[in-house]
């Protein structure tokens, strides 16, 4: 059964996302700066082919959503850690709303990667966009 993840495009954790976003759009990939030895990098490394990702950043109340796709490759295991995506969809103009009922609710700090929960109705609504 597929799992659903939200991943920040802030690869170097410095707020500068434009170059990485352009590269991810051009190559239909998702990238992570954390190594598999780090908790966040381990989650990225353990994703399975057939899982879905949404590339987005920010707190739920003002989340910027960029694209989504299905994981179609293993982790590159080289920095930048990279996974290829199929079914790549540009979501920049879509009205997808994350709110207080989604994972991490009203928190101002959202992890660089997290899993949407299938037992959370609000998260399930987001998963419909795959």
Task: Indicate residue ranges for each PLM-predicted region.
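Contiguous surface segments at macromolecular interaction interfaces
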Residues: 1-16, 27-32, 36-40, 77-130
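Short, charged beta-turn/beta-strand-edge "cap" motif at the junction between a beta-strand
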Residues: 57-62
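Short beta-strand-centered aromatic/proline hotspots
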Residues: 64-75
């Amino acid at each position: 059964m597929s799992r659903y993840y939200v991943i920040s495009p802030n690869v170097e954790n410095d707020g500068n996302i434009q170059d990485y976003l352009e590269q991810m759009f051009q190559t239909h990939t998702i990238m992570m700066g954390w190594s598999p030895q780090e908790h966040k990098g381990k989650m990225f490394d353990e994703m399975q082919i057939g899982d879905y990702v949404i590339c987005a950043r920010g707190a739920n109340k003002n989340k910027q959503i960029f694209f989504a796709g299905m994981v179609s490759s293993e982790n590159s295991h080289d920095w930048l850690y990279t996974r290829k995506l199929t079914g790549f969809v540009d979501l920049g103009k879509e009205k997808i709303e994350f709110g207080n009922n989604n994972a991490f609710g009203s928190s101002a700090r959202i992890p660089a990667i997290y899993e949407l929960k299938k037992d959370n109705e609000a998260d399930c609504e987001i998963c419909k966009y795959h």
